A protein has these predicted regions:
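Membrane-embedded alpha-helical bundles of multi-pass enzymes
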Residues: 1-180
């Protein structure tokens, strides 16, 4: 099993989730806790790296399945399948955050939606209003569906490389997210 599509998704997730979880560093000088700066840097770095890597792993999973499905499905259904896979992976990722940092008094469930791309569109009125009907996962579905459909329309059918589609789909998601 070669993870051909995994790495583009994972690499896209690392800077995205590094930005999302940058707030970990707001407690950086742990002087109030009596630790020196070097030790406090390491105390914060470890959970930051574990969280960013763990969250990026799921975008890598999406990239892997998007790459795999593009070889097995008809071209017309590719945006539908990619959007469905992304929504499923995002839902599983929300559970993972709670499991990763479970402790006494922790809540497990799909309510840890930190970093969901749908939140980047919260300032757009029609998107925000439509979220009451289909939620953040519907917005995620729409983002990936439109992005992958646009890239499919722009890509010639006889383009030789089989490794490009997952990167194209992930790039479409990145463009839509970061152009907000």
């Amino acid at each position: 099993m070669r993870p051909a599509g995994f790495w583009p998704g994972f690499v896209l997730g690392v800077p995205y989730f590094s930005y999302i979880f940058w707030w970990f560093w707001s407690v950086y000088p742990l002087v109030s806790k009596g630790t020196d700066n070097n030790l406090s840097f390491l105390i914060i770095l470890l959970p930051f790296v574990v969280t960013v890597t763990g969250m990026s792993f799921f975008w890598g999973i999406f990239g892997y399945f998007a790459h795999d499905i593009q070889r097995k499905t008809r071209r017309a259904f590719l945006p539908l399948f990619c959007a469905g896979i992304f929504v499923l992976v995002e839902y599983i990722r929300t559970w993972f955050f709670g499991i990763l940092w479970a402790g006494q008094g922790s809540l497990l469930g799909a309510h840890w939606t930190l970093g969901n791309p749908a939140y980047l569109f919260a300032d757009i009125g029609p998107v925000r209003q439509s979220a009451s009907y289909w939620g953040i996962y519907g917005i995620d579905f729409f983002i990936v569906f439109v992005g992958s459909a646009l890239f499919m329309l722009a890509r010639p059918r006889n383009w030789g490389s089989k490794k490009i589609p997952s990167l194209e789909i992930l790039s479409a998601v990145a463009i839509l997210v970061f152009l907000n």
